[in-house]
């Protein structure tokens, strides 16, 4: 076993340390199969991945029982891992103008042939929704040296077999809003709308949107004469061209 493999096993041992005896060993073997890439060949199938990793039938059954009936919680493992990273002191959070970014996004394990599961998530490679088990991920953005490395903070799993991507997105945003600290800003990809972020009451955020996006102020313009305004003034973050004419961006309120 190489030095890197030994160090990986030592970290896994520390992560599962709070878990009851027996279950901790089974979870360690399961996580080792995940890290080794054995789940890729079996498309996420647990028994196939464990068999590919060289575990015996008895060990495979023990891992399966620990996964679905063991006395453990994913947040215990995440907390233990974060404490290990903090004690190691190599990972450092990214800070921009005294703000710490926290990434919030969705991902999925694609299982097109999984029986009894109807939930679908958008697959960017296929450019359409495909059957898969969706997850919401919340992670601190940091780096080890010059390499950017996210530090997992929370996982939001789909609750039901038919849960929609929109519902999972909403629960993930609500979770992120509760976990966001005073000096943190949530970072979102283009898959989430500004309305969803506001409904989750996230106080500070940066969200990727279309280059031609526009919005409206939440206050009505000052009444001068004529018909009264029903909507706020249009705000255009970026200038754009239309029919050969340049539409200027809205002036900033402050810098």
PLM feature spans:
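Active-site-proximal, Lys/Arg-enriched surface segment
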Residues: 36, 67-146, 242-255
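Gly/serine-rich nucleotide phosphate-binding loop at the start of the catalytic core
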Residues: 1-68, 74
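Generic alpha-helix structural propensity
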Residues: 41-45, 58, 62, 72-80, ...
């Amino acid at each position: 076993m190489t030095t890197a493999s030994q160090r990986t096993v030592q970290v896994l041992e520390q992560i599962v340390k709070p878990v009851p005896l027996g279950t901790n060993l089974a979870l360690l073997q399961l996580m080792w199969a995940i890290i080794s890439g054995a789940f890729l060949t079996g498309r996420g199938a647990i028994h196939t991945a464990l068999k590919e990793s060289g575990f015996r039938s008895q060990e495979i059954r023990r891992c399966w029982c620990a996964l679905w009936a063991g006395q453990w919680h994913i947040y215990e493992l995440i907390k233990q891992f974060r404490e290990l990273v903090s004690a190691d002191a190599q990972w450092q959070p990214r800070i921009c103008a005294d703000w710490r970014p926290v990434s919030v996004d969705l991902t999925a394990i694609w299982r097109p042939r999984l029986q009894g599961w109807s939930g679908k998530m958008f697959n960017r490679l296929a450019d359409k929704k495909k059957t898969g088990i969706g997850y919401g991920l919340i992670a601190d953005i940091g780096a080890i040296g010059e390499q950017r490395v996210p530090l997992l903070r929370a996982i939001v799993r789909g609750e039901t077999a038919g849960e929609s991507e929109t519902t999972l997105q909403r629960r993930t945003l609500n979770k992120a809003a509760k976990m966001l600290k005073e000096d943190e800003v949530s970072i979102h990809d283009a898959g989430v709308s500004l309305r969803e972020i506001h409904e989750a009451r996230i106080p500070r955020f940066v969200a990727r949107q279309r280059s031609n996006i526009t919005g409206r102020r939440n206050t009505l313009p000052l009444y001068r004469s004529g018909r009264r305004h029903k909507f706020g003034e249009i705000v255009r973050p970026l200038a754009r061209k239309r029919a050969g004419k340049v539409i200027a961006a809205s002036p900033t309120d402050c810098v």
